């Protein structure tokens, strides 16, 4: 089944009892039992809910996995995955990882004894050097947030397998429409479903899919024990969003290519970060590893003052956290998504005060280009 078809017909669809074409929203907390201690598949909605189950079945198919679970946010999903590990365990992570991931690893999970090392995962040498006897996982974003570096997932899967550790991939930026990490050897794939999967800036959620049922059972135990589950209303919204994911990603990808080409040739832009550019060091890998380049673009215009002037001139782009929506969003990583990372560390990574991140939407590309052009001309 082709991806666009699977997004509509995959998983659990409709309701056999009523003939409803859409999955119902089961706004319920508990379920009648025929006898004490016996249930018919559901007992309490923290453990399972029919609407959430339908979403989980869908995303499991989309990621070609064996088990899937829906969480109350992307960070709840990431934290639950990290709770698979014990005090004294070590995780190797992408260096310019999302600020929330950096924060939970260095400010929360470290207090539980889970150690972390951040390296450039696009470098085989750095990853292999970072692995210790107590390393349990390699955690990757590809493309990374916000510098859009590309990591070779097949290579990382080989390194992880030889080291006897898990490979965890945050697939938020590319989505299963463009990239399927489990088919390339990953053990766990996760999403901030708030972003492209939802796609409309109206739901917060996280999704995790595992390559094995056994790993899925371990994760479900953590989820049920800690309680960070997604509610039925939000589960339904995500299923609705996923139906148009293919259409949206194609439109976003085409818009991003045009905008990146414009920015790459604009004198006000000092550095462009976009894997679709032939000048990007990961361009060839991005072409073979995924079916598209996605809708994220970062570029540096030199200073905080120039950034503020540029943002003040924009008319269509909304200054906001998050990404992956139908509307184009723009942010300043140093002051927004990555503000939790110490300034010295940000500068080491290249996350400067002049760096801007765009999440391209599905508006007409000509309107977006005109808006960016006039905003740059007047700084």
UniProtKB/Swiss-Prot annotation:
CDD domains named among the record's database cross-references: CGS_like
Cellular component terms per the entry's GO annotation: cytoplasm
Modified residues (N6-(pyridoxal phosphate)lysine): 195
Top-level EC class as recorded in UniProt: lyase
Phenotype reported upon loss of the gene: No visible phenotype.
Molecular-function annotations in GO: cystathionine gamma-lyase activity; cystathionine gamma-synthase activity; homocysteine desulfhydrase activity; pyridoxal phosphate binding
Cofactor entry: pyridoxal 5'-phosphate
Keywords assigned: Lyase, Pyridoxal phosphate
Swiss-Prot/TrEMBL catalytic activity: L,L-cystathionine + H2O = 2-oxobutanoate + L-cysteine + NH4(+); L-homocysteine + H2O = 2-oxobutanoate + hydrogen sulfide + NH4(+) + H(+)
Biological process terms in GO annotation: cysteine biosynthetic process via cystathionine; homocysteine catabolic process; positive regulation of cell population proliferation; transsulfuration
EC number: 4.4.1.1, 4.4.1.2
Regulation: induction: By methionine. Repressed by sulfate and cysteine.
Listed PANTHER family: CYSTATHIONINE GAMMA-LYASE, TRANS-SULFURATION ENZYME FAMILY MEMBER
Function noted in UniProt: Catalyzes the conversion of cystathionine to cysteine, and homocysteine to sulfide.
Record-stated family: Belongs to the trans-sulfuration enzymes family.
This protein's name: Cystathionine gamma-lyase
Source organism: Bacillus subtilis (strain 168)
Gene field: mccB
């Amino acid at each position: 089944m082709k991806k666009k078809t699977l997004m509509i017909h995959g998983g659990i669809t409709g309701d056999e009892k009523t003939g409803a074409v859409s999955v119902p929203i089961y706004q319920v907390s508990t379920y009648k039992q025929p006898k004490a201690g016996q249930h018919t598949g559901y007992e309490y909605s923290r453990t399972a809910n029919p609407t959430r189950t339908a979403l989980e079945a869908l995303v499991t198919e989309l990621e070609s996995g064996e088990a899937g679970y829906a969480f109350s946010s992307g960070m709840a999903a990431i934290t639950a995955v990290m709770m698979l590990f014990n005090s004294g365990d070590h995780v190797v992570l992408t260096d310019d990882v999302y600020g929330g991931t950096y924060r939970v690893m260095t400010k929360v999970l470290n207090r539980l004894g889970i150690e972390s090392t951040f390296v450039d995962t696009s470098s085989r040498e750095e990853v292999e050097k970072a692995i210790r006897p107590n390393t349990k996982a390699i955690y990757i974003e590809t493309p990374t947030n916000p510098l859009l570096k590309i990591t070779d997932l097949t290579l990382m899967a080989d390194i992880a397998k030889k080291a006897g550790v898990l490979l965890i991939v945050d697939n938020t930026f590319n989505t299963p429409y463009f990239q399927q990490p489990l088919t390339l050897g990953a053990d766990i794939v996760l999403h901030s479903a708030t972003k492209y999967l939802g796609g409309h800036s109206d739901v917060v959620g996280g999704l995790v899919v595992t390559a094995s049922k056994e790993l899925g059972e371990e994760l479900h135990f953590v989820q049920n024990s800690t309680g960070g589950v997604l509610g039925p209303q939000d589960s339904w919204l995500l299923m609705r969003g996923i139906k148009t994911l293919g259409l949206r990603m194609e439109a976003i990808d085409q818009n991003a290519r045009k905008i990146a080409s414009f920015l790459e040739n604009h004198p006000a832009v000092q550095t462009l970060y976009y894997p679709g550019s032939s000048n990007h060091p990961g361009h060839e890998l991005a072409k073979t590893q995924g079916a598209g380049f996605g809708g994220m673009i970062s570029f540096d215009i030199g200073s905080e003052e120039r950034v503020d002037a540029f943002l003040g001139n924009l008319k269509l782009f909304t200054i906001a956290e998050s990404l992956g929506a139908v509307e184009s969003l723009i942010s300043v990583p140093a002051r927004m998504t990555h503000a939790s990372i110490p300034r010295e560390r940000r500068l080491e990574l290249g996350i400067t005060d002049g760096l801007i991140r765009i999440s391209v939407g599905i508006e007409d590309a000509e309107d977006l280009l005109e808006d960016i052009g006039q905003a740059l001309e007047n700084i």
